[in-house]
Amino acid sequence: DGLEFLRKLMPQYPMPVVVISALSEKVFDAMKAGAVDFVAKPAVADRKQLDSFLCNELPVKIKVASTARVSRYKKPVMFDNNYSTSSKSETNLIAIGASTGGTEAIAEVLKNFSTDIPGTVVVQHMPPKFTEMYANRLDSQCRVKVREAKNGDIVAKGEVLIAPGGDEQMSVVKIADNYQVVLKKGERVNGHCPSVDVLFNSVAEAAGSHAIGIILTGMGRDGAKGLLKMKKAGARTIGQDESTCV
């Protein structure tokens, strides 16, 4: 099948691959095998949706994927485990953002999280419905609890909340001693909804120096300005090493 073909193709002839997939967990196996990105398969019966897919979404994905450094896909993401107890006590919130190639990078980071890690919020650019499946997959692989975020969720210690794909932007606000998720319909920012910049900007305002911002692999600029805002607010900021990025 296509997945097995991809597993044999990439080690011998690395090339940019965009997967067109129905709602299935196999898409994440394809990403692990080296695919650069994926798009949700459109409903063939819906001519308007099909035209939009063929004329807009798919060409953009292919254009972006064509610039990917696929020869590096086999390099593992190394997570620095030198996360001291003192750092944990000072950090109340972690925010992670990723785009193209980010599904596996996020998984590698979260697998290193212990159950006492500060509450974590994540934006990974992904189509609607896939985010819940992705969260469930991560939950089965990690020590921390991972699930898709819902409006009003409290960001709790040892828990990771994944922003749902769709038409809602995810931000975080501080209420008393807690950080709360806000999901609100909004315009695309940097071409994305949810947007990493929207999340990072809100974390900078809500948590300031008590937050950590992590930007992982991606092909665009989403998250760059937000991470800078977090840094200026006193947060610790971390970026994935270029050699392991797509």
Place the predicted regions along the sequence by residue.
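Conserved acid/base catalytic micro-environments in cytosolic active-site loops
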Residues: 1-246
